[in-house]
């Protein structure tokens, strides 16, 4: 038996029932899609720089992540389709930004958490 497992089986029915009831009202699959999109380090880099700069054109993003504009566009389009980013067109340029403050906070908190974990270990 390992230290990180219960040695006996005991179900806390009140907590389990409450959690199941609340979980049934949520949409974990859609939330999982957000985390799946952000599980790619290139897309995390893009989300991070958008949280810093507010808005960047596709060419700038491509330069920052050291890729072609086609590759940057692919990642940005995926982020847009999942509600993480939005875009606007100005003349011949397309500018992307994070969809809203919640997304920005999610990205910032993830980086903060990573720094805290790194400082402990």
Curated annotation (Swiss-Prot):
Annotated HTH arsR-type domain residues: 23-118
Start-end of DNA-binding region: 58-77
Keywords per UniProt: Cadmium resistance, DNA-binding, Transcription, Transcription regulation, Transposable element
UniProt cross-references to PROSITE patterns, sorted A to Z: HTH_ARSR_1, HTH_ARSR_2
GO terms, molecular function: DNA binding; DNA-binding transcription factor activity
Parts forming coiled coils: none
A GO BP entry: response to cadmium ion
InterPro entries per UniProt: ArsR-like_HTH (IPR011991), ArsR_HTH (IPR018334), HTH_ArsR_DNA-bd_dom (IPR001845), Metal_resp_trans_reg (IPR051011), WH-like_DNA-bd_sf (IPR036388), WH_DNA-bd_sf (IPR036390)
Signal sequence region: none
Protein's name according to its UniProt entry: Cadmium resistance transcriptional regulatory protein CadC homolog
Organism of origin: Staphylococcus aureus
